Amino acid sequence: MSSVITLFARRRVSCTEHNVEIELSSNTLSGHISESPVGVYKKAHRHGPGAYIITLKGSGYSLMWPEGQKWERFDWGPLSMMSPPNRWFHQHFNLGKEPIRQLALKGWGQKYPIGGWDQMFKSTEAGGDMIEFEDEDPAIRQMYVEELRKEGIELKNLPVTYRKRA
């Protein structure tokens, strides 16, 4: 039986990010390579355990936190690796003057959607596992803007009107 490798490209709407999706061995191992522009950060999301993110190019930081708790910051650069804990929200921020490129590998994907994969692209407001920019803690964006200023970089994400929190 031969192994099948499927590659496909997609452009995510959230931040003009470019992705190449990788599916190996009938999708028992999958991943993606993402490139995010300068001055951009991604929406927070969560999923099950076992995703490994390797930074191939660029520098920045990620925030990670379990639901209902305060986020913690983790800085990274080329060849850094991180693995978000099971069901922890995480969010990635480009602090460099060049696009970041990251490789994410995991033992699940579209064919075997364990670990909440199928909920990652659905808003938490709709019962999913992705926090829309309008629903995030405003301090997250403010911290990023301040960090970008130190580097002489402008925020490229679209403006946000935050929803009222209960």
Could you describe each region identified by the protein language model?
Residues I53-I54, S83, K97-D118:
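A short hydrophobic beta-strand segment most commonly corresponding to one strand
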Residues V13-N19, S30-H47, W88:
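Conserved short histidine dyad/triad with adjacent acidic residue
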Residues P66-N86:
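Short acidic-glycine-tyrosine-enriched beta hairpin
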Residues P37-V38, R46-E67:
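Glycine- and acidic-residue-biased ligand/ion/polar-headgroup-sensing regions
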Residues M1-T28, H32, P138-A166:
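A short, N-terminal "cap"/entry segment at the start of jelly-roll beta-barrel domains
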Residues E23, Y41-H47, R73-D75, F93-N94:
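Short histidine-centered beta-strand/loop micro-motifs
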Residues K42-A44, S62-L63, P84, H90-G96:
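Short beta-strand His + acidic residue motifs that chelate non-heme Fe in jelly-roll/DSBH
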Residues H32, A51, K70-E72:
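Short, conserved secondary-structure segments in the cores of folded domains
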